[in-house]
Amino acid sequence: MARVTIEDCLDNVDNRFELVLVASKRARQLAKGIAEPLVDVDNDKPTVLALREIAAGKITRDILNQPEHNFATSSLDLALSGDHSF
């Protein structure tokens, strides 16, 4: 897959600061398995997938209005949350 540029993403998001917020929230969803990728994975990491989804117009700033899912997905997450039942 060709590289994703900031300019490709800015066609679908208002500014670069909002792009950081949208991409980071989406990458977190993908990394935790909360959401399925909307583009071909092509062995990309969650951050690249998030940017590719934004550039393709599949993810918009509306993601910022979605509630956070508080799923602990690793023993580190559980340890940091204070849940020691693992």
Swiss-Prot record:
BP GO annotations: DNA-templated transcription
Classification via InterPro entries: DNA-dir_RNA_pol_omega, Pol_omega/Rpo6/RPB6, RPB6/omega-like_sf
Any one GO CC term of the record: DNA-directed RNA polymerase complex
SMART domains noted in UniProt: RNA_pol_Rpb6
Keywords assigned by UniProt, alphabetized: DNA-directed RNA polymerase, Nucleotidyltransferase, Transcription, Transferase
Phosphoprotein listed as a keyword: no
Catalysed reaction, written as an equation: RNA(n) + a ribonucleoside 5'-triphosphate = RNA(n+1) + diphosphate
Molecular function terms, GO-annotated: DNA binding; DNA-directed RNA polymerase activity
EC number(s) on file: 2.7.7.6
Top-level EC class as recorded in UniProt: transferase
Gene3D superfamilies: 3.90.940.10
Family membership noted in the UniProt record: Belongs to the RNA polymerase subunit omega family.
Function: Promotes RNA polymerase assembly. Latches the N- and C-terminal regions of the beta' subunit thereby facilitating its interaction with the beta and alpha subunits.
Subunit-level organization: The RNAP catalytic core consists of 2 alpha, 1 beta, 1 beta' and 1 omega subunit. When a sigma factor is associated with the core the holoenzyme is formed, which can initiate transcription.
Name under which the protein is recorded: DNA-directed RNA polymerase subunit omega
Taxonomic lineage of the native organism: Bacteria, Pseudomonadati, Pseudomonadota, Gammaproteobacteria, Moraxellales
